[in-house]
Design a protein with these regions (language model features):
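Metal-dependent phosphodiesterase/phospholipase catalytic core, i.e.
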Residues: 1-81, 99-100, 106, 122
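C-terminal active-site rim and adjoining tail of enzyme catalytic domains
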Residues: 80-162
Length: 162
């Protein structure tokens, strides 16, 4: 039985393989949520400081306050706002501007070519989750999506860019 890797394990793996990483910050709730959220973001920043140069890091979250904390504690890393398809509304640019982000990570459900082109033409990167069909991945790439999240990376290797 394999163990679930710790964040330290992920940092070690990234350093050994020179693999870029996406760190998704999850919300903290409860009566002490604000303090715990700040502590979590500080700890993530401390761990990421041990990454070797040249490893690209993206910090992403559905949680806007966490992305603002990431901007404070980790301004050197790119930040992405994660959207469910139904939550992507007309105020999306305001949200990204508030977070200091130039990246939209959006759910694949009902994503259209018009929406992809609108986001890309506005100067934002666009990553789509979760794309497991090769045909759909090709279509999104042809429409201009910057990247995809997939459970089937071995089937998507043809999309790798230099």
């Amino acid at each position: 039985m394999k163990k679930i890797p710790t964040f330290d394990d992920v940092i070690t793996f990234a350093n050994e393989t020179h693999m870029n990483i996406n760190v998704e910050l999850k919300g903290v709730s409860g009566p002490d949520g604000t303090r715990l959220s700040e502590s979590m973001v500080q700890q993530v920043a401390e761990k990421l400081a041990s990454l070797e140069n040249g490893i690209d890091v993206m910090i992403s979250s559905f949680n806007i306050p966490l992305l603002k904390l990431a901007e404070t504690y980790m301004p050197q890393y790119r930040r992405a706002v994660i959207f469910k398809a139904v939550a992507f509304k007309a105020d999306w640019r305001t949200i990204l501007d508030f977070c200091g982000s130039k990246i939209v990570n959006i759910e694949d459900a009902k994503l259209t070519q018009n929406r992809v082109e609108m986001i890309r033409n506005a100067g934002f990167d666009l990553n789509v989750w979760t794309v497991n069909k090769k045909e759909r991945a090709n279509q999104l790439a042809n429409w201009g999506a910057t990247g995809i999240f997939t459970d089937k990376a071995d089937a998507m290797i043809h999309l790798e860019r230099d």
